[in-house]
Amino acid sequence: MLGCRGCHGKDLEGTFFTKNEPQYGPLYASNLTVEIPEYTDAQLDGIIRQGVHPERKTVWGMPSEIFQHLSDPDFDALVAYLRTLKPAGKKLPNPQFSVQDRKDIASGNYKPAAQLVRERANQLPVDLGAGHALGRYITEVTCAECHGPKLEGNPNDPVGRIPNLIVVGGYSRDQFETLATRGVPVGGRKLNPMMVSVALGRLSHMTPHERDALYAYLKARAEQPQ
């Protein structure tokens, strides 16, 4: 599910996204079970891959900067799945911006999805050839959301230090499997809770072939001259 449940909730019925951050919003991740039927496939493409809403025009919080790289078959499969959801719960309110939100927007710290799509369109992980195409693609549409478009990390992220994925060079395939499926890094050290959530909620649900490809790409990337 490409992490949809991380914001939209385990049942995709939406969440009060800023519930524990009263300085923001209130901002809600929409209830996909009731909103998906309201849009055509083309409109969903605009929202998900382009960051453009057919009514509100501007989309906030959607990681369209990475979803713009979704292949057409994967996008079609995602939409086909979303259209199988039975409506449940209620439609949630549109975004409402607090004073802090508006300050962040004015300073450029909080950007609309369409702007991020434009800014990051050509910022991609290094191309290591056809043999690593699948692994690179997976990083573009998953890892890049937190680790950045070139997977270089962010030592100053508010949620905690996010490393350059060159660190995977220090993992064996078995160690990477433990990290990806159980959220346990080399040495058993404490991992950022966000990464534990990503491992258990996303990476562990990939096929072994996909994790093989992801590891092979990240390992090869780590072995490139720095």
Please identify what each model-predicted range represents.
Residues 9-45, 59-71, 99-107, 148-178, ...:
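Gly/Gly-Pro-rich "capping" loops immediately C-terminal to redox-active cysteine motifs
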Residues 50, 61-63, 94-95, 116-120, ...:
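Interaction-mediating elements
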Residues 7-12, 90, 185-190:
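Proline-centered turn/helix-capping motifs that create local helix->coil transitions or kinks
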Residues 54-57, 145-146, 153-157, 185-192, ...:
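Substrate-binding/catalytic groove segments of enzymes
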Residues 1, 104-139, 226:
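Electrostatic cytochrome c docking/interface patches
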Residues 1-5, 132-144, 153-163, 205-209, ...:
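Sequence context surrounding c-type heme c attachment/ligation sites in exported
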Residues 42-49, 53, 66-92, 174-179, ...:
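C-terminal capping alpha-helices of c-type cytochrome domains
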Residues 1-10, 44, 78, 135, ...:
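The canonical Cys-X-X-Cys-His
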